[in-house]
């Protein structure tokens, strides 16, 4: 009997398809997000060098007081933090890699918060 693939497998397949086309450069690095069951992570990556330039997550000391670390409010804080750190390093334009997740909820909140703080994508 054919089993229906689970959500994680489907997301990973989407991510592989997207990564064939989306790559970060030195001038326009890739803003990649990851959601675990308990936290949200974002990092800006230069794929040509294979280096993470800036990172932010809900594991940081400043976000310890949040009630939930996976909801929209937490995603907005992570988006604002990543944008501020990117601007400090001189990064203004990025390519948004949603990592196979739907552009909805915490993913959209993170992206909108980063845009409000000055990142262009």
UniProtKB/Swiss-Prot annotation:
Family: Belongs to the universal ribosomal protein uL18 family.
Known function: This is one of the proteins that bind and probably mediate the attachment of the 5S RNA into the large ribosomal subunit, where it forms part of the central protuberance.
Compositionally biased tracts (Basic residues): 1-22
Protein name: Large ribosomal subunit protein uL18
Any Pfam family hit: Ribosomal_L18p
GO MF term set: 5S rRNA binding; structural constituent of ribosome
GO CC terms of this entry: cytosolic large ribosomal subunit
Positions of region (Disordered): 1-23
GO biological process: translation
């Amino acid at each position: 009997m054919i089993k229906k693939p689970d959500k994680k497998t489907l997301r990973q397949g989407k991510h592989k398809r997207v990564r064939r086309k989306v790559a970060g450069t030195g001038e326009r690095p890739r803003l990649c997000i990851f959601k675990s069951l308990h936290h949200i992570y974002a990092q800006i990556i230069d794929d040509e060098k294979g280096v993470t330039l800036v990172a932010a997550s809900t594991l940081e000391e400043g976000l310890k007081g949040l009630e939930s670390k996976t909801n929209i409010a937490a995603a907005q804080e992570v988006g604002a933090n990543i944008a501020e750190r990117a601007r400090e390093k001189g990064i203004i334009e990025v390519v948004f890699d949603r990592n196979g997740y739907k552009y909805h909820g915490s993913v959209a909140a993170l992206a909108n918060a980063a845009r409000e703080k000055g990142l262009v994508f």
